[in-house]
Amino acid sequence: MNPAHLLILAAVCVSPLGASSNRPMPLNLYQFKNMVQCTVPNRSWWDFADYGCYCGRGGSGTPVDDLDRCCQVHDNCYGEAEKISRCWPYFKTYSYECSQGTLTCKGGNNACAAAVCDCDRLAAICFAGAPYNDNNYNIDLKARCQ
């Protein structure tokens, strides 16, 4: 790629990041957030971002409850999607629809997008069916997730 093009690309990508104090969210995680809000409208997305051993960054140990198990399954699903050539689940966008709490992954998604959409759809449905325990939010990972 031409060095001038790289410089322009870097400026376009970096300048919006410095304009905000909020860290940017990969596009797919934004879609996943919206899927969760579709199936669990009475809870904030952030309630799931630091829950148990698997909801949020990383994941290890035994899930603390059914909701945490949803996140473990979602992590594993992304791991399977990564086996598709050039598939990066955290950045792959897809087409889907939310209608009255029902999620549908639309046709026209390529293999990677279809897999990632299904991972997110199944996790959002799982979240809706699992009880939320406030005691499992922001837990001590070193003590409880070995």
Swiss-Prot record:
Q: How is the cofactor bound?
A: Binds 1 Ca(2+) ion.
Xref: CDD domains: PLA2c
Q: Where is the active site?
A: H74, D120
Q: Where found in the cell?
A: Secreted
Keywords of the record, alphabetical order, are: Calcium, Disulfide bond, Hydrolase, Lipid degradation, Lipid metabolism, Metal-binding, Secreted, Signal, Toxin
Where is this protein primarily located?
Answer: secreted
Report residues binding Ca(2+). Answer: Y54, G56, G58, D75
Similarity section: Belongs to the phospholipase A2 family. Group I subfamily. D49 sub-subfamily.
Q: Which PANTHER family match?
A: PHOSPHOLIPASE A2 (PTHR11716:SF94), PHOSPHOLIPASE A2 FAMILY MEMBER (PTHR11716)
Any idea what this protein is called? Answer: Acidic phospholipase A2 C
In the record, what lineage is assigned to the organism producing the protein? Eukaryota, Metazoa, Chordata, Craniata, Vertebrata
